[in-house]
Amino acid sequence: MSGLDLPWIASVAGARRARRAGRIQSLWAGYGELVRVDLDDGRTAVVKWARPPAGARDVSALRKRRSFDVEPAFYRSIAPRCDDACRVPALLGARGDGDEWLLVLEDLDAAGFTGRTDEATGPQLDRVLAWLASFHARFLGEHIDGVWPTGSYWHLDTRRDELAAIDDPLLRVSAPLLAARLTGARYQTLIHGDAKDANFCFSPASVAAVDFQYTGAGPGIVDVAYLLYGRADEPASGVDDARLDLYFDHLRTALPATFDADALEREWRGLYVIARLDFCRFLAGWRPAMWASDARGQRFVRANT
C-alpha cells in the first residue's frame, strides 16, 4: 500500500471520513510510524502503521514481524478485560497481512492521558507500579493464546545473536540458567514486556499503558526489574527495596483475598536479582559499547554472579 488507508480507518472508527493529522513518532528501526488521525465527527484516533523494510527477513526482522501479530491479539482478546486499574486504549480496528499492519486505537490524549515522561518519580512512578500490579494480578496463572510464550523483547530464545556477542564469559554461561529460573517460576502471569516509562501515559490522577508488541508469559517481577533499571536514584546495590515494597503492596491489594500472597511475594521478590541479571545479559550483548560504560550494571553483575 502506498498510503495510509484512511477510508478503512474511518470505517472501523465509526466515522465517514478520516484525515491524517500528523506523525506522533516513528517506530523502532524505521519499521513504520505512529499517526494521529482526525475523524469527521470531531474525534481523533491513533494509528500504528507498521511497514517492515522490503526483504528484511533476518532474526531481528522476524521477531518484529511476530510482534506486530501479537499486539492486535492483545487488543482483541486481553484488553477488554483491563479496567481503569490497568487502563489501556480501546481497539477500534486492526488488520495485517504479513507485510503491513494497521492498528487503530483510542486516542489516550483525548481521554485525558496527556502526560509523558522518560523517568517517572514520586506519585507517577507509584501509579505505574500499581498499574503493573493490577495487570499481573488479573492474569495470574492463565495461559493465553496469541501472545509470546515468554514475554519481553529481550528474552533469551529470541536474542541468540546478542548472547554470542557478550564478552563476559560468566554472564554468557549464566544466561540459560537465568532464563530457566524465570520460565520455571511457579507463579506465571501475563507481563507487559516493554514496561518502560515512555510507554505509560498519565492523567492528573491515573495512568494508562501502550505498546503491547512483546506481551507474554512470565513472572511479574520481570516487568518491575526492567522498569526500575538504571533510575537516577537507584540504590548502589541495584535492589530498590522501597519501590519493591510499593509494588507488592499494590499486588496484595489487587489479588483475591484467598490467594497466598505471601508465597507469591517470596518467589517474585527472590527472582528480582535474577530478572535484573537477565536484562543485564541482554544489554551486554545488544550494545557492548554502551554496556562497557554502564558501571552500575557491571557492578551488579559482579556482585550477583
Can you say where each PLM-predicted feature lies in the sequence?
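Conserved NTP-binding catalytic cores of kinases and kinase-like/nucleotidyltransferase enzymes
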Residues: 1-98, 203-207
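Regulatory N- and C-terminal appendages and interdomain linkers associated
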Residues: 1-28, 263-266, 270-273, 277-305
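Active-site acidic catalytic loop and adjacent metal/ATP-binding pocket
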Residues: 28-39, 46, 178-222
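Short alpha-helix boundary/capping segments
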Residues: 63-67, 119-127, 216-219, 235
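Active-site activation/catalytic loop segments of kinase-like enzymes and analogous catalytic loops
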Residues: 73, 220-256, 274-295
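Short, glycine/acidic-rich hinge or "gate" loops at secondary-structure transitions
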Residues: 95, 142-153, 257-264
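Conserved short submotifs of the Hanks-type protein kinase catalytic core
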Residues: 100-111
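ATP-dependent phospho-/nucleotidyl transfer catalytic cores
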Residues: 111-192, 203
